[in-house]
Amino acid sequence: LLNRIDEPATGRVLDPMFHADIPAGRLAQAKAAGSILGEQVWRQFPWIGCSHGEAGQAHAMPTTTDPVEGILARTWRPALSVTGAAGFPSIDSAGNVLRPKTTFKLSLRLPPTVDGELATQRLKALLEADPPYNARVSFNADWGATGWDAPETAPWLARAADDASRAAFGRPAAWMGEGGTIPFMNMLGARFPRAQFLTTGVLGPRSNAHGPNEFLHIDC
């Protein structure tokens, strides 16, 4: 069933409905950011490595080490994750028996211009249609949210960002999207279609709004 959603060898999501055309401006921003960050785009993550044998220095690798492709994969390409599972016995009680049912919790990241509700309906149809071996398959969605693609940056805001970046870092500002949904931004964008947005927040140590290590570390 999961192979209906993505390729098991590459992780590429198959259905065109989950994809979106990448705007030329966003592609240019990703190229500029990639040229600055280089391998930091993927080396910043704690890759698991082996500590024994001939492959003692080997570690897991991302699907791409190209900085630009890494940025686009996080922001403008869909990706499927299995975030939970139920119905499997623990190892100490597992036996050679059939399970009555198996449950997976899935997370499908979408490009910001893909409609979250329509994508949820499509995902349900893909998983429930023609079950293999006459199995019973059911899909229940928690929620499907549409991402947010910020409007084109006004010249005055771009100048302000460049001035601030030059004052702090000696270089003009660079732009890079982030692969996460903040539904409130869509609400604000719909309510104020001509507004410019500068969305930021500084969270101190251990604030951890959504995860165990979510805060900004700012060198002073």
Label each residue range with its predicted role.
Residues 108-112, 138-154:
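A short beta-alpha structural unit
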Residues 91-96:
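Short beta-strand/turn micro-motifs at beta-sheet edges
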Residues 76, 98-102, 171-220:
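Zn-dependent metallopeptidase/amidohydrolase metal-coordination segment
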Residues 104-106:
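Hydrophobic residues positioned within well-ordered beta-strands of beta-sheet architectures
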Residues 1-89, 114-134:
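Acidic-enriched catalytic cores of C-N bond-cleaving enzymes acting on peptides and small amides
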Residues 82, 136-141, 173-175:
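Generic structural signal for residues in well-ordered beta-strands
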Residues 3, 9-10, 152-195:
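Active-site-adjacent substrate-binding region
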Residues 87-90, 109-113, 144-145, 181, ...:
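Short, glycine-/Ser/Thr-/acidic-enriched flexible segments
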